[in-house]
């Protein structure tokens, strides 16, 4: 018996659940932006190739506590360097962080992975060849005429929310051609706290205008005042209605000058 059979894992049911989860995640990424969807396809290409490389080298890491694909990316996909780093962490962490051989997997597993890679490569190439982005075009077209219309945007400030850092980068690149854009994510929120407050919090003692647009992920969806702005754009819409209300609550605060 294969190792996973000895451990009595329900492979088929787990596989079906993962398929549904991946489908949902890809739909959400596509809903966010074309840029985010392409980034996800590119990640899937790398993840699939990483697995194929590990099978070829007879060194397959399955480590719940280690970002195996992240280690490959850090090593610029140098197999020896990546696997050395993974093995070092695996030994330190122990637990369920395991290394398998290719013989622990079904004989047709590699063939199926190779087929997956061909499909993903084809999808990525087709999406990369198409430069059209109607959603981003509509955003750029409405940026000054609608979102910064002085009749509705009386403060000259704009808050943009997105669930994806890839989408955030694309928005900032386009909007940054005419506006001063502040990008905030989990990676830099703490170091930008004073800047955020001075530029977007109506209650701040120091008021600055270094930025007129803040593009943020969900990291600022709660626990922060952004009410110097009275216009919010949800570039993508969270499926959780509570999260949407939390976003809107960033500008609907006591102290706002907006009517």
Describe each region flagged by the PLM.
Residues 1-187, 192-198, 222:
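Helicase motor interdomain insertion/brace
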Residues 176-259:
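Conserved RecA-like P-loop NTPase helicase motor core
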